[in-house]
UniProtKB/Swiss-Prot annotation:
Additional remarks: The porphobilinogen subunits are added to the dipyrromethane group.
Example of a GO biological process term: protoporphyrinogen IX biosynthetic process
Identification of the protein by name: Porphobilinogen deaminase
Family statement: Belongs to the HMBS family.
Enzyme class: transferase
Organism: Ruminiclostridium cellulolyticum (strain ATCC 35319 / DSM 5812 / JCM 6584 / H10) (Clostridium cellulolyticum)
Length: 293
């Protein structure tokens, strides 16, 4: 009997997402034995600093990558938006989920209907930039931790509201906590937001993930991540990308903020869904004027 060991962060959301992958594997072949192996990543342990101060998104995958390299697990499961933008040829992304809700959500303290004077909590420069445009008279402040940790900070009075990815809240069954959804025009999402990624070792067989994988998610992620990567969009850079497929076309929207000049720019391009990477580069070219100092 074939056995597959699945590596995951140990947060409740990460485990739920891993269980979604496991359900698809069982549907493909009920005889495959599955083992879930959870671990804390460096990004989960260091919560008193923003990600750009401690090494970026790679801190959420480092321990899981080591487990793959050392053959302690066979695949690992991630929120794709939290993965580094540079591909690792030895540990490729081998499957992507269908995209769930890509929007960001506004969450108020439990029982709260009126605004208070505390800041709006947000984990990314991307969100903070767009929140300032939506709420020019409100302060924003960084917030770290898993969803439950952030909700506790919110409910204890540290923040007047927080902004989280809608997909994660829904997967946790906490949709009732959402006060409002921001449209993708109000807050443009992070590249690959709402998509779960599965990583494995190069050269191995991953047919067991056929029922999980979405070619549409691969297409839109290639466009979004190409744009963000080429614009040097790490955790400290306010940058966003969102692609949709309409019939045979991809529509790609992007946001870039030049911190040196203070200029922000939104642009949109469209093209054949057969060429998502090229479309990402096309959007980069449209942003060139904003990137110059």
């Amino acid at each position: 009997m074939k056995k597959i060991r699945i590596g995951s962060r140990d947060s409740k959301l990460a485990i739920i997402q891993s269980e979604m992958v496991m359900a698809a594997i069982r549907e493909f072949d009920p005889d495959i034995e599955l083992e879930l192996i959870t671990m804390k990543t460096t990004g989960d342990k260091i919560l008193d600093k923003t990600l750009d101060k401690i090494g970026g998104k790679g801190l959420f995958v480092k321990e899981l990558d080591y487990a793959l390299y050392n053959n302690e697990v066979d695949i690992t499961v991630h929120s794709y938006k939290d993965m580094p933008l540079e591909d690792n040829p030895k540990l490729p992304v081998v499957a992507l989920s269908k995209r769930e809700d890509p929007r960001d959500a506004f969450v108020l303290p439990q029982g709260e209907i009126a605004e208070n004077n505390e800041p709006i909590g947000s984990s990314s420069q991307r969100r903070q930039l767009q929140l300032k445009a939506l709420f020019p008279n409100r302060k924003t402040a960084p917030i770290r931790g898993n969803v439950q940790t952030r909700l506790k900070k919110l409910d204890s009075g540290e923040f007047s509201a927080i902004v989280l990815a809608a997909a994660g809240i829904k997967r946790l069954g906490l949709e009732s906590r959402i006060s409002r959804y921001f449209s993708v025009d109000e807050i443009l999402p992070a590249a690959s937001q709402g998509i779960i990624a599965v990583q494995g070792r190069a050269g191995e067989n991953f047919d067991f993930l056929k029922l999980f994988h979405s070619e549409e998610s691969l297409c839109i992620s290639q466009a979004e991540r190409t744009f963000v990567r080429e614009m040097n969009g790490g955790c400290s850079t306010p940058i966003a990308a969102y692609a949709t497929i309409v019939e045979s076309e991809i529509i790609l929207k992007g946001l870039y903020h030049n911190e040196a000049t203070g200029e922000s720019k939104k642009e949109c391009v469209s093209g054949s869904r057969q060429n998502p990477v090229e479309l990402g580069y096309e959007l980069v070219k449209k942003m060139e004027s904003c990137r110059r100092i």
